[in-house]
Regions:
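Acidic, low-complexity cytosolic segments
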Residues: 1-21, 30-154
Length: 154
């Protein structure tokens, strides 16, 4: 599977698990769409560009106000929320929710999907260096069991 396929699969899983999420996308920090699951009335390029601009402003505000690294950008409107969360060093997970969404649950699932996106993006870089790739679900390979010596059992 390609990186784009794995990202799309992660977004599809996110929308399936989080029924209150109406749209989701992974965009580059430069504002380019990488994968999306959007309704017809949402333009992928426009969402990606706006998300990158919001992320840049959020990072700058957090830094200049001495609040550390940006964790997420949260926008609330009368009809729902737009939430942006870093997903690796150069990509952003975007979720658009319905009004009344259980934001805590959405954020919980976003963290899980952001970790998966990070693994996919890291594996894409690692593959070019001869490192292990992600599995067909976009998850990193399971770690090898630690070897134990007889002496450690005594």
């Amino acid at each position: 599977m390609t990186k784009a396929d794995l990202l799309s699969l992660a977004l599809d899983d996110f929308l399936t698990i989080s029924s209150e999420v109406e749209a989701a996308a992974v965009v580059s920090a430069d504002g380019l769409p990488m994968a999306s699951a959007l309704p017809p009335n949402v333009e992928e390029d426009r969402l990606a560009a706006m998300s990158a601009a919001l992320l840049t402003l959020g990072e700058r505000a957090a830094s200049e106000l001495g609040k550390g690294d940006l964790a997420q950008v949260f926008i609330e409107g009368p009809r729902g929320h737009v939430i942006l969360m870093a997903a690796g060093p150069d990509s952003v997970l975007v979720a658009v929710t319905a009004r009344g969404a259980k934001v805590g649950l959405v954020l919980f699932e976003m963290r899980r999907i952001a970790e998966r996106v990070t693994a996919i993006m890291t594996a894409a870089v690692g593959e070019s260096r001869g490192l292990a790739a992600v599995d067909d679900h976009g998850d990193p390979p399971a770690p090898e069991p630690a070897a134990t010596s007889v002496a450690s059992w005594q």
